[in-house]
C-alpha cells in the first residue's frame, strides 16, 4: 500500500519527497514502531461557490496503529500551526499503517504564505518529522488549476463532425429514394421480362393470335343454340374467334343441283409446295341451295371430288 502511494506522489511530481530511493522504502520496511514519513502532494485549486480554494494533501506512511496518538498538522515554516482534517489510519498490505490529512483554505488566506510544511510526531510541539517546504506563491509555485479551460480546435472539430453527419444523412436519404423509385417502377423498366410479358403490360404490344394450320382439318364442335351458324361465323370460330384488321369473310357461293345427264366437273386442286397442309378451300360449303344445309369436312369434300369420273361433254374446257 505504501509503495502505491509513493508511486502516485511521484507521478504527480511531488516536490516534498526525498531524493533518495532508500529513504522512501525504508519506513515501509521497518513496520510497526518505526518513524512516520510525511509527504506533501502539489496543491490543487478548486472553484467552490464562485471562490477559489486551495487543497493541500499530506500523506503519512508507517504511522502508529489505532489507539496511539499520531497527530498531523500544517505550518508556514515559522512555527505557526494550522489544524487539518485527518483521516483514520488504514492498514497496508505489508502490515504498516497509513494516514491522510488535507488542508483546504481560500486562496486569499494562503496568499500571505510563501511556503507550507506538513509535520507529524508524538505531539503538536514536537517537530520530529517534517516535509520539505512547499512553495505556494510566486513563479515557483507548483499549484495546479482544475478550472475548465477552453480547448484548442474544439470548434473546428465540431464543424467537421457536423459536416460528416450531414453527408452521411444525405447518402442515406438518396439510397431510400432510389429504392422506393425502383419498387414503384413498371416491370419493363426494372428489366423483369416475366412481369412485362403479361397482357396488361402498357409498354409492350399485345401478341397476335396466329391460327393453327391443322385447325382447318379438325372437326369443330357444333355452334351453341341461339347463335348464327353462317359460313362467316364458322370460319371465324375455326380461326380462333378473331379476324385480322381490314379483312372481310365472304361466304362461298352455293352449289347448283347436279343434273343426272350432265356431270359437274371441277378442276382438281393442286397442293402448294410451300404449305405442308393441303388446303382445299373453305371448310364448310352448302351442297344444295334448296335442300337442308349440311357441313362437310375438307378432307371428305376433296375425296368426293377426286372420285368423280371425267366429263362426257367435249365442249367442257379441259375435257
From Swiss-Prot:
| Cellular component aspect of the GO annotation | plasma membrane
The residue range of the signal peptide is 1-16
Q: Where in the cell is the protein located?
A: Membrane; Cell membrane
Which keywords does this Swiss-Prot/TrEMBL entry list?
A: Cell membrane, Disulfide bond, Glycoprotein, Membrane, Receptor, Signal, Transmembrane, Transmembrane helix
GO annotations under biological process? alpha-beta T cell differentiation; negative regulation of thymocyte apoptotic process
Q: Which pairs of Cys residues are joined through disulfide bonds in the record? A: 58-118
Show the ranges annotated as biased composition (Low complexity): 189-207
According to the record, glycans are attached at 78
Q: What is this protein called?
A: Pre T-cell antigen receptor alpha
Organism of derivation: Bos taurus
Amino acid at each position: 500500500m505504501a509503495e502505491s502511494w509513493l508511486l502516485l506522489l511521484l507521478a504527480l511530481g511531488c516536490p516534498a519527497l526525498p531524493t533518495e530511493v532508500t529513504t522512501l522504502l525504508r519506513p515501509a520496511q521497518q513496520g510497526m514502531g518505526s518513524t512516520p514519513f510525511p509527504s506533501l502532494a502539489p496543491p490543487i485549486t478548486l472553484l467552490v461557490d464562485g471562490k477559489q480554494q486551495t487543497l493541500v494533501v499530506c500523506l503519512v506512511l508507517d504511522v502508529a496503529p489505532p489507539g496511539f496518538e499520531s497527530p498531523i498538522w500544517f505550518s508556514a515554516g515559522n512555527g505557526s500551526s494550522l489544524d487539518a482534517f485527518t483521516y483514520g489510519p488504514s492498514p497496508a498490505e505489508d502490515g504498516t499503517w497509513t494516514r491522510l490529512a488535507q488542508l483546504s483554505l481560500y486562496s486569499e488566506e494562503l496568499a500571505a504564505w510563501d511556503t507550507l510544511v506538513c509535520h507529524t510526531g508524538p505531539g503538536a510541539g514536537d517537530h520530529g518529522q517534517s516535509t520539505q517546504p512547499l512553495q505556494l506563491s510566486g513563479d515557483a509555485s507548483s499549484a495546479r488549476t482544475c478550472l475548465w479551460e477552453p480547448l484548442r480546435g474544439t470548434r473546428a472539430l465540431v464543424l467537421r463532425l457536423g459536416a460528416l453527419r450531414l453527408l452521411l444523412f444525405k447518402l442515406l436519404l438518396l439510397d431510400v429514394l432510389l429504392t422506393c423509385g425502383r419498387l414503384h417502377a413498371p416491370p419493363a423498366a426494372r428489366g423483369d421480362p416475366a412481369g412485362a410479358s403479361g397482357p396488361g403490360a402498357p409498354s409492350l404490344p399485345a401478341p397476335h393470335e396466329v391460327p393453327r394450320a391443322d385447325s382447318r382439318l379438325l372437326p369443330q364442335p357444333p355452334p351453341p343454340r341461339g347463335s348464327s351458324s353462317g359460313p362467316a361465323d364458322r370460319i371465324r370460330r375455326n380461326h380462333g374467334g378473331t379476324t385480322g384488321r381490314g379483312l372481310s369473310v365472304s361466304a362461298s357461293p352455293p352449289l347448283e343441283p347436279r343434273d343426272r345427264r350432265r356431270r359437274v366437273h371441277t378442276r382438281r386442286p393442286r397442293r402448294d409446295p410451300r404449305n405442308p397442309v393441303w388446303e382445299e378451300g373453305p371448310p364448310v360449303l352448302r351442297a344444295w341451295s334448296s335442300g337442308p344445309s349440311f357441313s362437310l369436312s375438307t378432307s371428305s369434300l376433296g375425296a368426293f371430288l377426286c372420285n368423280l369420273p371425267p366429263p362426257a361433254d367435249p365442249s367442257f374446257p379441259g375435257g
